[in-house]
Each structure stands twice: as C-alpha cells, then as structure tokens.
Amino acid sequence: MTNKPKDTTYPITKQFSMHFSPYEDRLIVRAQRTDGTEVHMLLTRRMVMLVLQQLLNKLPELTGLEKTPAVYWQEVLQMAHQGAMASKAAADREIADQQAAARADLPAAGDATVAAPEASNPTDVVPEHLFLATELLVQAGEESLTLAFKGLPMPDAMVKPSQYQPIFAIPLEVDNVHQLIELLIDKCQHAQWHLPLELPWIEPPNGDGGNKKYSLRYH
C-alpha cells in the first residue's frame, strides 16, 4: 500500500453498491465506472481491514481534529458522523421518492410490455469485469481523499499468470468517508467478520450497542 497512485491511471467511479457473498466469503463491490463499464470487485476481510484502517487514519486530518483539543475529539467525530448519516438518509429518501414517482408514471400492468425475465440467481452469471482487489492506494487532499484499487482479473488469475490491473478509484468527501465506514462495518457484521476496532463515536448499524462496541484508537 502506498500513499499516492503515481503514474497509473484509474477509471473513476462515483456510484457503487456492496453486498456479502457467503459463497465467496468476500464482500462484492458492484461499481459503475465513468467510462460506462460495470465492474465487480472482490474484497477479502484483510483488504476490508486495510480500507477501514486508512479511512480511520485519515479522518482526524480530514475533519480538522488536529486543531481541536483531544478531549473533544470523540464528540466532534460523533457529531460529524451523525450529520453524514443524516445526509445519506435524506438523499436515500429523495431517491426513493423519485423512484416511486417514476413507477407511478408507468403504464398499467395490462398495457405494459413483457420484459425479459431476470436471472434467478445473480451468482449464476459471471460478470464480464471481475477483479480480486489486492492493492489499495490512497491520495489525500485538504477535505477529501481518493481510494484507488488494483487487482487481478478473475477467474483468469486462478488458472494462468495475470497482470495486476487498475480497477477503479473512488473520490470521497468527508461525509462520504463516514458513510463508507458505516457501510463497511455493516457488511462485516452481516458477514460475521470480527473487527478489532473500537469506535465509541459510531452507532452500530444494527443498533445493538450492548453487544457490539466500536471505538477509535489513536496512536
């Protein structure tokens, strides 16, 4: 892992989803790159921990904690995290309202054209662009950072020597960093992956504050 992506060019993505695959025992990131291609990226538990460590290490600098007395750090982080998640909830509601309005404008069921049936199981179809993430590169700005991933093409890399390729880069503002931390923790809980993290400023996604505690350790 290095701090700058150097001369390698990475396709940018600003839209992605994430789910846990019990079959792969990995998180699968499905991203739409700005060049129009869709890519699937496999994240191992080790790689997820690396991403989380980098996000948490950069967060104090991104949020200006260095200018804040250490005694107030947890409170500032908690307020920033709650604000970021509230913004996401508002954006999600707006998207849901737009989708509901679009569905309301569709023709009645009797007039609708028959659509092609979707695959019953998404794992039955191997994505055209599938990579195993093996390297994370981080570039930090004043109030933003970019995560860039390299990896091996799958399943080709399992049967023959393959070159490491740039998968995509994700530009993140401060709110996005908080939202990604929450998303990764949520998916790791679903995967039942133990996270050696303590983050008292973040509410566990399942609301189970009694059994799961996350607090940030400063070194």
Task: Label every PLM stretch briefly.
Residues 70-81, 128-140, 196-208:
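DNA polymerase processivity clamps
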Residues 64-75, 97, 104-114, 190-202:
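Short glycine-rich, low-complexity/disordered patches
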Residues 2-29, 83-161, 215-216:
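Intrinsic, low-complexity N-terminal interaction/targeting segments
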Residues 149, 154-209, 218:
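Mixed-charge, glycine-accented linear interaction segment located at domain edges/termini
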Residues 38-99:
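Acidic (E/D-rich), amphipathic helical modules within compact regulatory domains
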Residues 33, 37, 41, 65, ...:
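Alpha-helical rod/repeat scaffolding segments in eukaryotic adaptors/tethers
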Residues 2-65:
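The feature marks the first
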